[in-house]
Amino acid sequence: MFRQRDILSVMNKLIVSWQRFVLICGLTAGIVSCATLPISELPSHNFGHRVKFLVMHFTAIDYQKSVNALVDEGGLSAHYLIPESNDPSYPNSSLEILKLVDENKRAWHAGNSVWQGRTELNDSSIGIEIVNVPECHRDKQAGKGIQTEHGENRLCVFPDYDPKQIELLIALSKDILARNPDISPTRVIGHADIAPTRKNDPGPRFPWYELYQEGIGAWYDNDTFEQYWQRFNQYQPNIGLVQTALRTYGYDILETGILDEQTHNVVSAFQMHFLPWQVTGQVDSKTAGAVFALLDKYFANKAKSLMTRYIAEQSSDASSSSALEYAFKRGQIDQVFPMVERS
């Protein structure tokens, strides 16, 4: 019995000692955590903001499927989701913006993307998903190897955007731009602009010009556009120059001098944004005029440099044509024989 009491006494003492130890540690930690570190603020002028781009998307699926895709673990995401009126899967009577990811955090909406020399735009952008469901099909006879977003092998019917959606989008975008000064007009872009080989959203029905009128995003001045168009009708810039102009504005395109697949995709994305009434993927005087009108407005020095090249190439081509004509005429024979009709 004596031994049992001794054992109990020792155990009680150990328990009390442990409780005191825990209490002392807790108090010590509280004192340390509450103490003010010797930190003084000395603001530097040398810093930047994380957010530099605002990217517009359409979901291509209804509201409920969009929520599942953007919210459930393991999927994609965006910072905001704007539902659509008359969507049977939307449970509320009035539209409201859903905030899915805090703006200070990275959302998974841009994927493999490039704009104005920056890559992986998830790191530096805010993404807005808008519920809008186009109907797209691929040509079954074209083969599995052809999987481009633009071209004859793909058919898409794009519906108009809900006006109530656009009202919410304009209000949200203005609020975002007011808080993120690094998002310049040319940095308000669509998913197709930053990933033209694999995306076509927000599509040619997206009201870019309406947003521009509200102070959101870029657009050309009509008079400037018309002047470039008239000039390029007389002498169209070569494909290499247009490729460089598109790259200067922000698109991920290399100058190859030929109308290759990358050029077709980039030109299609550009036309959906700035010439939505003619999405052909072809380089013509209107497309070139729109690109140069945008550069003239937002990157004037670069536009001037490209026009210097344009004039030099025009003069060079004119000289080459004159030399070729002279080469044909300088001999005694200036006709091609045999002639179809002999005199």
Model-flagged regions — what are they?
Residues 5-22:
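Bacterial N-terminal signal peptides that target proteins for export
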Residues 32-33:
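C-terminal motif of bacterial Sec signal peptides marking the signal peptidase cleavage site
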Residues 36-182, 186:
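Active-site-adjacent loop/helix surface patches within enzyme catalytic domains
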Residues 67-68, 114-117, 152-164, 196-198, ...:
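Second-shell loop/turn segments in exported
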Residues 68, 176-191, 254-258, 279-282:
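Surface-exposed patches in mature extracellular/periplasmic domains of secreted proteins
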Residues 81, 204-228:
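Acidic, His- and aromatic-enriched active-site or binding-groove loops in soluble protein domains
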Residues 232-304:
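Short acidic, glycine/serine/threonine-rich helix-capping segments at coil-helix boundaries
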Residues 276-342:
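Extracellular LysM carbohydrate-binding repeats and other cell-envelope/extracellular binding modules
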